[in-house]
Amino acid sequence: MLERNDLWNLIKFSMEQDLSKITFQTFVEPAKPLQLDKAQMTIEVPTQLHRDYWEKNLAAKFTDIAMQATNEQIRPVMITEEERQQLTRDKDSQVTTGNVAGQQPTTATTPTFMRETKLNPKYTFDTFVIGKGNQMAHAAALVVSEEPGTMYNPLFFYGGVGLGKTHLMHAIGNKLLETDPTSNIKYVTSESFTNELINAIQTKKQEAFREEYRNVDLLLVDDIQFFANKEATQEEFFHTFNALYEDDKQIVLTSDRLPNEIPQLQDRLVSRFKWGLSVDITPPDLETRIAILRNKADLEGIEIPDDTLSYIAGQIDSNVRELEGALARVQAYSRLNNSPITTSLVADALKSLHLSSKLSEVSIPVIQEKVAKYFHVTMADLKGKKRNKQIVIPRQIAMYLSRELTESSLPRIGNEFGGKDHTTVIHAHDKITKALKTDAELQKAVGDLTGQLKS
């Protein structure tokens, strides 16, 4: 029998010939062979979603290729990275699966059949940089683009601004159009959906509105959290959702939070949004930020050294949008000064342009330090579990300011406060927001702290 790695390399090579580039890079390339016994090969994959995809779509192909190569029946046994780490947690060394997919940036193929989909042709799977914080979301999006209306319906992305939710949503639509140019795809923001509904009611064209939204193959709705408190919109969308779901049409939604955390969202909508798969997207780590910048620089034809990219990535840890904005500002500064892009030039450009994020020094630890000093409590108190009022209110204010003044995700804020659940952060933010309307003392405290942090 072939050795484990030899057999794996042969199987990978064969699959690469048969599968699309994106499918291979997403599901096969990150996989790692751990052990080969007589009848099975144990393979590690990044997430449960990867394992499900392998078991449904790739296991039989694996066995066929192995049979041809060894004349033996060998089946793949999938194990997730987390499961493997639990099994080997007593060991010091850990296998690194890689945060970035490592694919070279490619020029996106612009579909020539954009019609009225409102899809951005630049938002494709090819232009999406995969990292630890978005790996599962990317894999789920790819599955949905290949098998809409079957496996994950609805697909619900949630996370902070500028992390790639909209990019993945558009990538699904663009991929489906490449596969079937006749597909009827509708992309809309929640605000546009509401405005179109209001207009339809005013002009008495509700039936035309329903016809437009209930006869699509793929419905993409961005920022669903803005449906909160809009009863008529929720009522209409409830029936639209049902019509599409019952007809096996794919629905993809995005939000800055989980369905059950959206205030004043009808329980029946919350329930339906949970029928499929909810996937969070978290801020990119350093390696992913560098890869994002390199990808953007290559696409834009910007000449920039690797150490300079690393410097930019080290300055900004909030989101992709701000990263790309920083690169654009650096490019403009370089042109204005007719100078090549260097680390020194980048430092000057970002300083003079007052870029936010780390450069403004407003971070969660800084907020905690200011709040602790203001209320005469300790940092340990803010991060601890004490429930007395003298501690709880400063802690909630610190969480509120972390949500308002940084781009950090809810889970990250929770982690900075001693591993609190993200729902605790939401509760704190909502409570302070409500109290600020009537509590003059609280208004002064929050105002003082905000002024200190922004000065």
From Swiss-Prot:
Domain I is involved in oligomerization and binding regulators, domain II is flexibile and of varying length in different bacteria, domain III forms the AAA+ region, while domain IV binds dsDNA. Belongs to the DnaA family. CDD domains: AAA (cd00009), Bac_DnaA_C (cd06571). One of its GO terms (cellular component) is plasma membrane. Residues 84-107 are annotated as: Disordered. Residues 118-334 are annotated as: Domain III, AAA+ region. This is Chromosomal replication initiator protein DnaA.
